[in-house]
Every structure is written in C-alpha cells, then in structure tokens.
Amino acid sequence: MSVLVGKQAPDFTVPAVLGDGQIVDSFSFSSATRGKYAVVFFYPLDFTFVCPSELIALDHRMDEFTSRGVEVIAVSIDSHFTHNAWRNTPVNKGGIGAVRYTMAADMTHSICKDYDVEAVPPGVAYRGTFLIDRSGVVRHQVVNDLPLGRNMDELIRMVDALQFHEEHGEVCPAGWNKGDAGMNASPSGV
C-alpha cells in the first residue's frame, strides 16, 4: 500500500454521475477540483451492504462539506449507468437516493491502482479516503478493509484540522476539534 500523503493526487478522467444527476462521459478530477479542497472516497461496489450506509451518511453531511469548500467524489469500479440506477433506487429498496456528490466510474480499475486501493482478490476498491488540499496535494489518507465502514464525523474533523492549520499555521493535537486551540510546533513538548 502506497503512502500518497505529501504527494500530488493522481488525476483521472472517467465517466461519472454528477451530484445533480447529470451523466457525463468525461469527468475530469483536476478540472472539478482545481483550487478547491477535495475528498476522494473509494468504496467496493454499488448495490451492496456497508457501501450504502457510508454513501448515505456522506450525503447527509454534504452541507458541511460544501460550507467548507470541499468537492466530494465517490469512486467504485461500477459503470456510470450502474451508479445512476443505484441513485434512482429508493433507500428502502436498497438504493442510495439522489446523493449530491459526483460518483466516478472506474471501470478499468486505473484510479484504484493509481491510489493503490485495489483489493486483489476480489478486484474491488478498499474503503480508501483521501483528503486533498487546494494545491492538489494529498494531506490525509486512510484505507479500511472491506467490512469496516468509515466515520463521517472524523472526516469532517480532518477537513477542519487541515483548514485550521492552513489559516493559523498551528498544529492540531490529538483529539482536536473545530473551536479548540491549536499549538505551535515546538521541541519543548506539550
């Protein structure tokens, strides 16, 4: 597993379903995120079990991501047509509803490979999350095994920590939350 933190986020152009439901044949990650914060959110497959719980939870937090200037892109190996069918399936019938973020179709597995999150076997993405700054640099990454769902509160906390650090130049100690004091990086300790 590669560590991408501190490196330029791999770019990609693939078919996708945008947050407004529009299907596009050529979604460009770099064009959509230029000058913005971004979260790239890998998940194994549409129409499965843990995945809808994560994607619905992610959508429930979209106002918080949007207010922080964060573009959210979900990625799986499913086609854009399958993504669209899943969006159009009611939640009580196994769907995710009209989520408000882009769903990219990594049908060739190239994005999974570039971000080094492909689980082989079975050839699907691990649950990888990448927080990318406005310069396109990966600042945080976490990769969960297939049965382990993610916590959206922690993802929002990491966005807040990155933005706090960029604004104030201070670091964020363990357990830091928005509104808490930061600290100066110092060899004298805490």
Predicted regions and their residues:
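Chalcogenol-based redox active-site neighborhoods
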Residues: 1-190
